From Swiss-Prot:
Catalytic activity: RNA(n) + a ribonucleoside 5'-triphosphate = RNA(n+1) + diphosphate
Subunit text: In cyanobacteria the RNAP catalytic core is composed of 2 alpha, 1 beta, 1 beta', 1 gamma and 1 omega subunit. When a sigma factor is associated with the core the holoenzyme is formed, which can initiate transcription.
Major enzyme class: transferase
Native source species: Prochlorococcus marinus subsp. pastoris (strain CCMP1986 / NIES-2087 / MED4)
Residue positions binding Zn(2+): C74, C76, C89, C92
Name assigned to this protein: DNA-directed RNA polymerase subunit gamma
Length: 634
């Protein structure tokens, strides 16, 4: 096996994001081809040739820079097939390799003039303004060519370092400096634009400033102290990461791989392209125009205007709309910049990296499952057969029901009874994980034992709803299948719903009846004033046991809120114990009968309870019988 076929694994502890130096930006995009040629700089705004539909050389889709657009084929077609792997075509300079390299190979644009990075300039807080200790408004005046800034006062007495000067003020000073009778030997130096900003940042001695600020903090109070702390925090971060402040001003900008900003041909022959290509094209056009103006020694005012336009083009590329007018495309729609692609719910991180679709997972609406135990959930058969398909196929082959995977899949598609039987065996004891977004605490994802149910909705026990913050008004939940034995064990031991009774935040019970359960319990035990209380001994309203009442209710001989007399020898919790009975009489056999508002008790001559009938509703009988039954089973 050759080394080229070996996949190397790089293990790392963390990922760190920091400011890239101009050299690193160029290193990202610069490559030396096997023939020694250095490529990487994008110099032309063209994308593809509309006649040949091939990428233009040195353009935004250049095959020499980013790699071939077709596997193992150079631009001119001289080399085709995998046998020419690694060869660089002498005619077109394209390396013969896989086209997927166009997903990770970068380029760069060498800028004719430095530009400020809009994140550090216009972010909140503005790190450039904090480091230089200049108000943000003044920094913007410098960057966007509205004001000059003093870089060196020279021998001029009235000027201060970092002082802002308007065009007229600087002209007056120039006249004074260059006058015949001038005594100024060392001329003051002023700058404008991102070049001046870069010079100011280069002049900063961070270690010395940090020492001075620490001394100043000890004697400061209130708002001034807070401002100093903010500044020293930024300086310490620069020192800790070995980053230089002048890196916040860009000399080169990276061009992301072409397959991440594609251009596709539509049916009518037209092309649809990523907004980034338009933004990059604006930058390249303005950069090339500025380079040409500098080359022909154009007037300073024209060059300065072009530099400002280049700054605005780079701002729009990095974060469109952060400053100035938003760049719009067709239909007056704002173009999506690099920041728009990264940030927000639909951005690269939340949508594509954190919100990835994973195998062995499903999603469906949840409905209440009143007959489930707390550690169980109802899993639709249609979903279960899809999630557990590899396990089912393995068992079908092992039990000699089918001979191969293809036959097993056909049997599964038919929905054969044997398949359902095998599925039942597979899910027995195999926990699944249910997750409801947003997962704000650890109980947002819990393990359950699946029970096969009909329909297409996941059934959930109502008691676990508070932990998930779920209700049954259309909420959806995701299902995940733990595959490894360790994962299954962990799910069963730690994540099973019946093991998560208490809230990890407060220590109080989180498994509490809510919504449907509270309403159902109230409805079941509610007293209806319009139902007449029966007399004791009424054959249709007197029952020998709780079970008899439930049978009569299920047989529809009695309603849920009707009053009934029922024999019950257990304890009754009511307020009548402290009062005297309404009636008490001795019977011929020596026993005693006591009548209360809601019960009739019969005692023998030794005052032992012989029988007790209570007056209650059918709903309360159902509730009590269910609770007694549950408690006796545990």
């Amino acid at each position: 096996m050759t080394n080229s076929n070996l996949r190397t694994e790089n293990h790392f502890d963390y990922v760190k994001i920091s400011i890239a130096s101009p050299q690193r930006i160029m290193d990202w995009g610069q490559r030396t081809l096997p023939n020694g040629q250095v490529v990487g700089e994008v110099t032309k705004p063209e994308t593809i040739n509309y006649r040949t539909l091939k990428p233009e050389m040195d353009g935004l889709f250049c095959e020499k820079i980013f790699g071939p657009s077709k596997d193992w084929e150079c631009h001119c077609g001289k080399y085709k097939r995998v046998r020419h792997r690694g060869i660089v075509c002498e005619r077109c300079g394209v390396e013969v390799t896989e086209s997927r390299v166009r997903r990770h190979r970068m380029g760069y644009i060498k800028l004719a003039a430095p530009v400020s990075h809009v994140w550090y300039l216009k972010g909140i807080p503005s790190y450039v303004a904090i480091l230089l200790d200049i108000p943000l408004r003044d920094v913007e005046q410098i960057v966007y060519f509205n004001c000059y800034v003093v870089l060196d006062v020279g021998d001029h007495k009235d000027l201060k370092y970092k002082q802002l000067l308007t065009e007229d003020e600087w002209l007056e000073i120039e006249d004074e400096v260059y006058a015949e009778d001038s005594t100024i030997e060392n001329e003051p130096v002023v700058g404008i634009g991102a070049e001046a900003l870069k010079q100011l940042l280069e002049d900063l001695d961070l270690n010395q400033i940090a020492e001075e600020l620490r001394e100043e903090i000890t004697n400061s109070k209130g708002q001034k102290r807070a401002k100093l702390i903010k500044r020293i925090r930024v300086i310490d971060n620069f020192l800790a990461t070995n980053a230089k402040p002048e890196w916040m001003v860009l000399d080169a900008i990276p061009v992301i791989p072409p397959d991440l900003r594609p251009m596709v041909q539509l049916d009518g022959g037209r092309f649809a392209t990523s907004d980034l290509n338009d933004l990059y094209r604006r930058v390249i056009n303005r950069n090339n125009r500025l380079a040409r103006l500098q080359e022909i020694l154009a007037p300073e005012i024209i060059v300065r205007n072009e530099k400002r336009m280049l700054q605005e083009a780079v701002d729009a590329l990095i974060d469109n709309g952060r400053r100035g007018r938003t760049v719009v495309g067709a239909n007056n729609r704002a173009l999506k910049s690099l920041s728009d692609i990264i940030e927000g719910k639909q951005g690269r991180f939340r949508q594509n990296l954190l919100g990835k679709r994973v195998d062995y997972s499903g999603r469906s609406v949840i409905v209440v499952g009143p007959k489930l135990k707390m550690h169980q959930c109802g899993l639709p058969k249609e979903m279960a057969i899809e999630l557990f398909q590899p396990f089912v196929i393995h068992r079908l082959i092992r039990q000699n029901i089918v001979n191969n995977i293809k036959a097993a899949k056909k049997l599964i598609q038919k929905g054969d009874d044997e398949v359902m039987q095998v599925l039942q065996e597979v899910i027995e004891g195999h926990p699944i994980l249910l997750n409801r977004a947003p997962t704000l605490h650890r109980l947002g994802i819990q393990a359950f034992e699946p029970k096969l149910v009909g329909g297409r909705a996941i059934q959930l026990h109502p008691l676990v709803c508070p932990a998930f913050n779920a209700d049954f008004d259309g909420d959806q939940m995701a299902v995940h299948v733990p595959l490894a034995l360790e994962a299954q064990t962990e799910a069963r031991m730690l994540m099973l719903a019946s093991n998560n009774i208490l809230s990890p935040a407060t220590g109080e019970p989180i498994v509490t009846p809510s919504q449907d359960m509270v309403l159902g319990s109230y409805y079941l035990t509610a007293l209806q004033p319009n139902f007449k209380k029966p007399n004791f001994g009424d054959n249709q309203k007197t029952y020998a046991s709780l079970e008899d009442v439930i049978f009569a209710f299920e047989d529809k001989r009695v309603g849920l809120h009707e009053w009934v007399w029922v024999r019950f020898n257990g304890e009754v919790d009511d307020d009548e114990e402290a009062n005297k009975p309404k009636e008490s009489k001795e019977l011929e056999d020596g026993s005693r009968l006591e009548t209360w508002n809601f019960r009739r008790d019969r005692f023998d001559s030794q005052n032992n309870l012989i029988s007790r009938f209570i007056l209650t509703t059918v709903g309360r009988v159902v509730m009590n019988h269910t609770i007694i039954d549950s408690v006796s089973k545990t």
